[in-house]
From Swiss-Prot:
<feature type="glycosylation site" description="N-linked (GlcNAc...) asparagine">
    <location>
        <position position="105"/>
    </location>
</feature>
<feature type="signal peptide">
    <location>
        <begin position="1"/>
        <end position="20"/>
    </location>
</feature>
<dbReference type="InterPro" id="IPR045170">
    <property type="entry name" value="MTOX"/>
</dbReference>
<comment type="subunit">
    <text>Dimer.</text>
</comment>
<comment type="function">
    <text>Oxidizes L-pipecolate and L-proline (6,7% of the activity for L-pipecolate).</text>
</comment>
<dbReference type="GO" id="GO:0050660">
    <property type="term" value="F:flavin adenine dinucleotide binding"/>
</dbReference>
<comment type="similarity">
    <text>Belongs to the MSOX/MTOX family.</text>
</comment>
<keyword id="KW-0325">Glycoprotein</keyword>
<keyword id="KW-0963">Cytoplasm</keyword>
<dbReference type="Pfam" id="PF01266">
    <property type="entry name" value="DAO"/>
</dbReference>
<feature type="glycosylation site" description="N-linked (GlcNAc...) asparagine">
    <location>
        <position position="142"/>
    </location>
</feature>
<dbReference type="GO" id="GO:0008115">
    <property type="term" value="F:sarcosine oxidase activity"/>
</dbReference>
<dbReference type="InterPro" id="IPR036188">
    <property type="entry name" value="FAD/NAD-bd_sf"/>
</dbReference>
<keyword id="KW-0560">Oxidoreductase</keyword>
<dbReference type="GO" id="GO:0005634">
    <property type="term" value="C:nucleus"/>
</dbReference>
<protein>
    <recommendedName>
        <fullName>L-pipecolate oxidase</fullName>
        <ecNumber>1.5.3.7</ecNumber>
    </recommendedName>
</protein>
<dbReference type="GO" id="GO:0005576">
    <property type="term" value="C:extracellular region"/>
</dbReference>
Amino acid sequence: MVKNTSVIIVGAGVFGLSAALELTKRGGYTIKILDRAPPPVIDGSSVDANRIIRSDYADAVYCSMGIDALEEWRTNPLFKEQFYGSGLMFVGRDNVEYRDMSLENLTKMGVSAAKFQTTEELRKLFPKWIGELNDGEAGYANFSSGWANAEQSVKSVVNYLAHAGVSFISGPEGTVEELITEENVVKGVRTTTGAYMAEKLIFATGAWTASLLPNDHTRFLATGQPVAYIKLTPEEYIRFLTNPVYLDFDTGFYIFPPTPDGYLKFARHGYGFTRMQNLKSGKVESVPPKKPLVSPILPKEAELDLRRNLQRTYGEEISQRPFYKTRICYYTDTADAEFVFDYHPDYENLFVCTGGSGHGFKFFPILGKYSIGCMFRELEEPLLKKWRWKKENLEFAALDHSRAGPSRQELS
């Protein structure tokens, strides 16, 4: 009887779960997933009411991946119940290069989209939309895109993996404190209460990556993005139910159609907020809070910006309503917004699977195919190069043309 290869995955978010999903499909692995909390992890970036599912990318690789992922969202039993095909409205005036390149890629790949240049043209596509375009703004609608219930999607995959024999270890037993190493080989991980050994280790630790990895050479930066929710009346819910996802890359503001339980969620995809901390290792890194905050008070600038954009899209009355809930959602940023699927340069068997940079969730159904493909060096060289561990000193977010809004700020 052939012995299974033992694998430890640190991190029970989308990157870790998708890697486990791919390894489970391949067979021959005994998998343990460690996290300080059971999934869906309450403060993970992959856990929330909704996430945008789109193929709209100025990067042709991600555009193609998005089209493939959308097909899985529509048809795969693990995901299709969580997908809402609302369509997406892509608006811009200043950041037109990203918008226009996205539309060009979609067209080349056979995805139809409807362009609009005036509010009247927009409302022919979405009759219930009450927002106005600013002077010079234009955009397009992609009716194949939409959104997904992120939390329920995670639950669906966790249940599947558990039934397939994957072990989930959480609490102090799953809280990783350090690596167990022997020269340039990682033998296992030490947790708060014990240790786990394995032949292969995958670090999919999201916004905690820089604080957990030794000598990470500042490849990753945790940035917090402001998120808020407002409760709609039953009449408003019915009125706005057929609205699309709205995405404005001039401001970074985006907003979803109402959730089935009647909430509007909106946020900013920007340069974010850092939370620099002195770590026991001597490093200074941006790190999310150890204990998740329930409805944290948003920075005043962020609240005003969210309300200003909410007023533009959903009207004055709704924009002045008290927030039902708020959140700081922590991204794992890389300098160029590329994922990192590669071995740590100091350890030959430590595979790092992270760097979502605010756009990883949509690929949940197919992400493991690419991350594990990189782990086994099965992908074509351009993809291996795209997602390699980059040693160049690049300025964070300087190469991510999807970001907008104020410069990065430190949380006070």
